[in-house]
Amino acid sequence: MAEEVNGIINVYKEAGYTSHDVVAKLRGILHQKKIGHTGTLDPAATGVLPVCCGKATKVCELLTDKEKSYRAVCKLGVITDTQDTTGTVLQTKDISGVTQDELSDTIQSFVGDIMQIPPMYSAIKVGGRKLYELAREGKEIERKPRPVTIYAIDIKDIDLENGSFTMDVTCSKGTYIRTLCHDIGEKLGVGAAMDQLLRTKVLIFEVDQALTLAQIEERIQQEDRSFVLPVDQLFTQYPKMQVADEEAAKMLRNGNPITIGKLKSFNEVKKYQNKSRVLVYNENGEFRAIYELRGNYYRVVKMF
């Protein structure tokens, strides 16, 4: 039996797959169950979906919380029940009065901390049921606005002749890009719906390095695992430390606190953004844990 894959795979999610579909197919390709994704992408959306395998599933929540980047194509003058063009058209409006400057200013007005009302067609649960399940039954319930942050919007193209615009968006966890498109259209007074969505980046994972499921399967058949990112490479902001003796090695194996003098530097000297947290390696140089300095002891944050 092949050795278990431990690390993060930068999957290119193709249109038509749910995030759960990707995980299910990867379980078949890798022949292992311990796999988890790091944040849902709509079935119609494409792009970066980091998938954690084996021991790396312990960092899933750390990746889910990070900012993400997208490229979205939005259609002006149309309002749908799903806030994207896959939904039922509820209303169409004339956009002939919209100018390029007005559209550009409206788009940029959403940069910063904003409040978003989640769409009915979303996986948010209310009373134990997902909103999209209620929406499919023709029900609409009140949703509370949620705070999200739009860090940047770069307008890539405005095509008023065809009633569309393309933008690159960097945003916080929990941001709905189709809701952003909808809200831009609403503020303009003409409506808008998202037409295409590509997730371009999550942390260090970029779309041009992402692999499709077919490409991953081919690599695995060739016994090539070079595309699997080891967990410690996610945390380059933390210094690397190695156990200094057998006593420290035993402490590490058990996840016990380790005194400062029992860890030695594993790195070339350089400045780190965060010195209180360290990556700890065993006597064989294998990454085993993230520890945090509290007083005179390093205490475990996460074991791997």
Positions of PLM-derived features:
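Catalytic cores of RNA-modifying enzymes
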Residues: 1-172, 183-211
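Accessory RNA 3′-end/elbow-binding domains used by RNA modification enzymes
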Residues: 1-14, 20-37, 41, 45, ...
